[in-house]
Amino acid sequence: MPAHFQRARNEEQRAVRRQAILDTAAAMLTDMPVAEVSLNALSRRVCLAKSNVLRYFESREEILLELLDAESRAWLDHLARELPTAVGADAPPATRGDGLAAVLARSLATRPVLCDLISAQAAVLERNVSPAVALTYKRAALANAEVLAGLVRGCVPELDERGALRLAGAVFLTAGSVWTHAHPSSAVRAAYEADPALAEMRLDFTETLQEVLEVFAAGLLARRRVD
């Protein structure tokens, strides 16, 4: 049991119990995809009744949105340490844009939990929450996008603030989409194996994401030069 008391009787104990629920859900995501993390299974793992879990979070989706924010912030902290030395400051803008795309794609590929959560965000996680929870999450998501935009401008200062924020938004949007297509169902994988002509439809996550981000960054830089 994650806490030694049976009932949270004050704010400190409530915070401990709430964090225990989040930590348990995070541990589950290392063993299974987002789609398999149910509220019932989480309740059993955290040794609480389902009704008690719902005292701390209004739904499974709220829990997972909080984890998505936490995973995003952890990734951004890592990027802030990696990017300054990973992208050559003296290279031409286009080369730095390509280098940035490569670092972002490789970095996200090492964080499957984050990518899985991003892929479920709009279609699943935002569908069973109250306006208050949605507002909290969207504010956090915007803050994370602004942090990423700042890191983007550190590598490619030729982009203005709006362009950097657009690229940051594209990173999150594209990562979720590419992750889903790069991890198809067993039936689709079997179809790929059965027909070699479908080989071109099989996507490698890192390679595909890098290529898309390279094109997006190049387009923003080209538009900036024209403007």
Model-derived segments and spans:
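Basic, helix-initiating cap at the start of DNA-binding domains
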Residues: 1-33, 40-44, 87-92
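Alpha-helical structural segments
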Residues: 16, 20-27, 62-85, 106, ...
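Amphipathic alpha-helical interaction segments
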Residues: 20, 41, 99-103, 166-173, ...
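Helix-turn-helix
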Residues: 28, 35-62, 66
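Hydrophobic alpha-helical connector segments
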Residues: 66, 80-114, 136, 167-171
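Helical hydrophobic small-molecule/effector-binding pocket
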Residues: 98-129, 181-183
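C-terminal peripheral helix-coil segments that are non-catalytic and often amphipathic
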Residues: 142-158, 177-227
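Membrane-interface starts of transmembrane alpha-helices
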Residues: 156, 160-168
